[in-house]
Amino acid sequence: MLEINEFGDSTYVEWGDPDRFFGGMALFKAGKAQKLVFTGGKMPWNKAKKTEGEVLRKYAISNGIASEKIYITKDVENTADEAVAVKELISQSKRIILVTSAFHMYRAKRLFEKEGFEVIAYKVDYKTEGENVTTIMDFLSSSGNLAKTESGIREIIGR
């Protein structure tokens, strides 16, 4: 799993997927960075009192991460906001390990580089396995394909 041979000042875990959390935890525990940063991700329509970052902080502490090594950004709604919030929170860190889905990495990496970070990409949550063979079933309507379309549109508009 830990195929990354580089080290960063911080490991930043984007929100929205448990693979990101577990990937970030594994990198931190392997000594790849000195800080673990979670997002204060919270959508305006979400009435929960806690952000995902606050919940993940609790899980990280219960898994042996010292609380002083964990940072949480202010509330953010999208990846562009995340990059700015991370820069404000850990401005002294120049090199980060960005943990996000393989599908989302290209855009996320560009946004963090725009904020001045040197980004080491750590991709999780791959959507394909091995060789992808197209069959007639790929051309039929399905709820799964609708979900893939939604993911693509969200990536294009930056949500």
Which role fits each region the language model picked out?
Residues 1-143, 149:
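A structural signal for short, hydrophobic/glycine-enriched beta-strand patches
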